[in-house]
């Protein structure tokens, strides 16, 4: 019998961002996503184990209480309105002339409107818009316009702006100016997100002399989440019963089969899933799995497995409004559970030659999903948290007056297939009793297919609204944010108390990304969303997100090095160089890998 508990506490504060300021300022956040988080996390894991060797039984109880509290912070100071207008080179005289009825500066806009009405080419209108803006803000960059839009979204404008046309000042001009000059008055209160997680698992195991054993148990988990953004409380309960039977035959063949039945609910939705049994629906969802492992010879193993999968959307995916890295997570009450199955066939072979020994493994896998849950990035109306999916939606957002948000919403992909193979080897070469080389090499090939892409493309080809969101950046058959090939190698040379190691990571290009970021389809001229992307994601010296991604969405490899020494039994030091070759790479749009980084680490064991 043994029992005890583990306790963890973590407090951190960090800045992160999902959208860059521009291709020329890739490591600076966009003003729309200038956010970080500070958080405190506490966890206690009690456990109790009792084993009776004479009866071949064991009882295990595991528990967990987890609490987290975090809130949004701004890691960098937002620019003031005077700084923004100064950076844009604002021509006050031009603004005064317009107020006095001299519209010469707006001539490019008027010309563009006339050309657009005659040619129906959006580029004529947009050239006129930006031509007039250049007269007012001659030094402005796309990032400066983002600063201005972000400032207006945060501070608002005086009411009764329409009265200026009649020579009347807004009635709340003085309070508004006071807020501009004293921005601390406009700071929003801290909005803290809190999460409570209670978990309990009981497991019973019985072994027989003939090589059979059975494992069964019960699991209960209760989660309570408070959103500081919407001031809503959501609760979920997950109850599961499981059983697995294992049998070994002839000292070579091991067979296992198991079933798990789950009940899940959120708030008052007591039946998140149903299963029909003898014509009646019960609120439990069973999943099955089975596998076998056969020892062909010494250090040679053949394995096969099959398992069903079922996952209910989490509270965050379905109900919460949350900011992560400055990008909002928006609720989708219609997201459904994802389900599927996975099959794998593998072969593992041990080898030894002199001082070299290790294992090689080859496996093929196939996974199929129905209603697979994926996130989709887009623009959202902060008034009702809905996705902006048309010009009408955008107009409604402007009327609501709470601005727009950039974020992600979880939704279902009707059908997905992911299959491929994995080859790996790991082992050790011993030079002498003081020196050895450890290695781990692995290659993965994946085909991540959207099985319904043709049907979706046919539907998207009927879209006529210029702001209607499509699923991904191209018409291809692949799922978003997945490469086809990846390779990883880890080497560690150990000599007495010294170790020298290296990591090599290689990945192929990304196959597709979100439509809001890029549209890789061929077109005769830019559409409205291309201009929206140009403002939101910036441009620098003619470089846009699209051109940057086209240049950097390629195969890439990174190399990390480390050197360590164990000074005493309790104290060890390690010096690391990450991205040794200072490779510039991008693993998703606006996510540029960290440059060469030096890290010093000390480990102390008590």
Question: Where on the chain are the PLM-derived regions?
Answer:
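Membrane-embedded beta-barrel scaffold of Gram-negative outer-membrane proteins
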Residues: 60-64, 295, 301-305, 336-407, ...
């Amino acid at each position: 019998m043994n029992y005890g508990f583990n306790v963890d506490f973590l407090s951190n504060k960090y800045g992160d961002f999902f959208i860059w300021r521009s291709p020329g300022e890739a490591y600076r956040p966009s003003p729309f996503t200038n956010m970080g988080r500070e958080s405190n996390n506490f966890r206690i894991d009690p456990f109790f184990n009792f084993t009776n060797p004479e009866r071949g039984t064991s009882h295990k109880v595991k528990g967990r209480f987890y609490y987290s509290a975090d809130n949004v912070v701004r890691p960098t100071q937002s620019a003031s309105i005077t700084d923004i207008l100064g950076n844009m080179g604002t021509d006050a005289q031009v603004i005064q002339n317009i107020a006095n009825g001299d519209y010469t500066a707006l001539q490019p806009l008027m010309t563009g409107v006339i050309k657009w009405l005659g040619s129906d080419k959006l580029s004529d209108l947009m050239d006129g818009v930006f031509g007039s803006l250049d007269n007012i803000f001659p030094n402005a960059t796309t990032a400066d316009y983002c600063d201005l839009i972000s400032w207006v979204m945060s501070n608002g404008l005086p009411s009764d702006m329409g009265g200026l046309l009649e020579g009347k000042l807004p009635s709340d001009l003085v309070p508004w100016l006071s807020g501009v000059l004293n921005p601390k008055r406009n700071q929003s209160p801290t909005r803290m997100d809190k999460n409570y997680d209670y978990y309990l698992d009981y497991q019973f195991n019985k072994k027989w002399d003939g090589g059979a054993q059975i494992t069964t148990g019960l699991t209960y988990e209760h989660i309570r989440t408070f959103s500081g953004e919407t001031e809503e409380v959501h609760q979920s309960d997950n109850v599961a019963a499981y059983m697995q039977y294992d049998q070994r035959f002839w000292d070579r063949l091991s067979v296992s089969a198991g079933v798990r039945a789950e009940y899940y609910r959120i708030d008052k939705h007591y039946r998140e899933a149903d299963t029909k049994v003898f014509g009646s629906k019960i609120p439990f969802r069973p999943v099955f799995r089975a596998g076998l492992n056969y020892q062909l010879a010494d250090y040679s193993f053949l394995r096969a497995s099959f398992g069903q999968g079922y996952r209910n959307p989490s509270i965050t995916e379905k109900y919460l409004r949350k900011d992560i890295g400055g990008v909002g997570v928006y609720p989708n009450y219609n997201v459904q559970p994802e389900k599927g199955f996975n099959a794998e066939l593998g072969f593992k072979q041990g080898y030894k030659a002199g001082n070299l020994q290790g294992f090689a493994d080859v496996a093929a896998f196939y996974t199929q999903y129905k209603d697979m849950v994926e996130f989709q990035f887009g623009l959202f109306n902060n008034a009702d948290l809905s996705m902006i999916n048309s010009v009408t939606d955008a107009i409604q957002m402007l009327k609501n007056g709470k601005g727009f948000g950039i974020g992600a919403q979880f939704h279902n992909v009707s059908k997905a297939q992911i299959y491929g193979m994995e080859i790996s080897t790991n082992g050790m070469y011993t030079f002498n009793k003081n020196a050895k080389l450890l290695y781990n090499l692995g290659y993965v090939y994946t085909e991540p297919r959207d099985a319904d892409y043709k049907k979706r493309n046919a539907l998207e080809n009927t879209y006529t609204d210029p702001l209607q969101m499509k699923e991904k950046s191209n018409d291809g058959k692949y799922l978003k944010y997945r490469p086809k090939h990846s390779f990883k190698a880890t080497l560690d040379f150990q000599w007495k108390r010294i170790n020298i190691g290296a990591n090599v990571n290689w990945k192929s290009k990304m196959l597709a990304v979100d439509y809001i970021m890029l549209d890789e389809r061929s077109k005769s001229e830019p559409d409205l969303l291309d201009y929206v992307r140009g403002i939101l994601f910036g441009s620098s010296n003619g470089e846009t997100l699209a051109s940057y991604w086209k240049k950097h969405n390629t195969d890439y490899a990174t190399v990390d090095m480390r050197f360590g020494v164990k000074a005493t039994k309790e104290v060890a030091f390690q010096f690391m160089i990450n991205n040794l070759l200072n490779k510039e790479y991008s693993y998703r749009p606006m996510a540029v890998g960290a440059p060469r980084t030096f890290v010093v680490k000390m480990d102390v064991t008590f």
